[in-house]
Amino acid sequence: MPAVTETFSLGAPVEIGRIEKELKKLWAEGEGAMTRASLINLAVYSEDAGSLETNTQLMSQLTENHACRAIVIEANRKADENHAEAWISAHCHVSRAGSRQICSEQVSFRLGGPCTALLTSIVFSHLDSDLPFYLWWQAEFRAPMDPLLWSWVDHLIYDSQTWKDPKAQMALVDVARKEADGRMVLCDLNWTRLDKIRAAIAQFFDPPAAHHHFDKIETVEITHAPGYRSTAILLIGWLASQLKWTDGKANGDRTFQLTNAARKKVMVTLSETAGEPIGALSVRSGNTEFAVSHSTGSDLLIVTRHDADQQRMDQVMPAGKNDVVALLSDELMRGGPHAVYARVIDRVRNLI
C-alpha cells in the first residue's frame, strides 16, 4: 500500500453508539451545499498500524468517481486491552456542473484487543441498507472464517500479490465463497493488474487466420518484477484457460510444463527483473513470435508479431497503472461474476 504523503483528518470523533445520529447532524448542517451520494457499501479492513490514515487518503481519491459509504477499520488483534475509537467524515467533490458538492460519508474505526472479534457486528450495524456490500480485505485471511460475515458480502476484494502462502490463502477464500453459497464475486487486484496485457495478447489471436497457432505454441517466456511471481502465475493460468492447456505442473520455481489441446507439451519459463509487474511476455509458435513488453519510461505496451522471414513491426497499446486507486477504481467499474478469473484459479492451483 502506498505511503501517506500528506496528513488526512479522520474527521470528528464520535461515540460508537451515536454514529448514525451524528451522521444525520452532519448532513443537516451541510444541507443546501452538500448532496449525499452512495452507490455501494465499501468496507476496508486492515491490520497495519497507520492504515486508517492511509486508507482515508485512498477513499478521498476513490470517491471522486465512486460514491459510497466507506467503513474503514484498523484492527490490532495482538493488543492486550480492549480499545475502540470511531470518527465520521465526508469526502466531498464539486460536481461537474460546479454548483454543488457531492459527498460520500466515511465511518472510521480503530480497534484493539478482544473487541476486534466484534468486526462482523460493527460492519453490519453501519451498512447503508439495500446497497451492494463490497469488502476490501487488506490483511491475511485466517481460520476460522466467520460464516455470518461472508454470507453478507457481495464482492470480496483482495490482492493475492501480497499473500505469503498463496495456497493456504486461496483455500480460505474458497471457504468464504462457500459460506456465501457461491454468490460472492471474487475481485483480485492482482488479476486486475493484468487487464491491459491480457487485452494486448488477445488481439493477436482475434483474427480467425491466427487460430491455427493455438495448437502450435511451444514456449512462453514471462518477465516479472521482484515480488510479482504470483502475477505471472495468474497470467499462465489465463493462457491455460483460454487455450485449453491442461496437466500443469511446476518443474522447480521458474519452469512449468503444460499440455495443449493437441496433447503437445508447452514449456513456460519465468525470469525476474526490476520494472513493471509484468515487464515482458513472448509466445513462440514455430517461426512466429508474439511479444508484449512495457515501453521504458511510459505507460504504453509495445506489441509485436514477428515472423522469421519478415521485418519486425511494432504497435503500441495502453499499459494501465500499477496504482492501488487505479486498480480499485477499475475493479469497481466492472460487473458480472468474474467467471474467467474463477477458471484461472482452478488452472493455477498446481502451480502456486
Language-model segments: which ranges?
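A short acidic (Asp/Glu
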Residues: 53-56, 119-120, 144-147, 229-235
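ATP/pyrophosphate-binding catalytic subdomain of soluble kinases
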Residues: 190-252
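Structural alpha-beta junctions
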Residues: 61-72, 127-133, 151-156, 177-182, ...
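Conserved, well-structured core segments that form the ligand-binding/active-site neighborhood
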Residues: 108-109, 113-211
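C-terminal structured domains
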Residues: 1-8, 12, 18-34, 38-41, ...
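An N-terminal, globular interaction/scaffold subdomain
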Residues: 1-136
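Acidic, Ser/Thr-rich peripheral helices and adjacent loops at domain boundaries
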Residues: 84-97, 154-163, 176-182, 269-276
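A generic structural motif
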Residues: 69-78, 135-139, 160-163, 185, ...
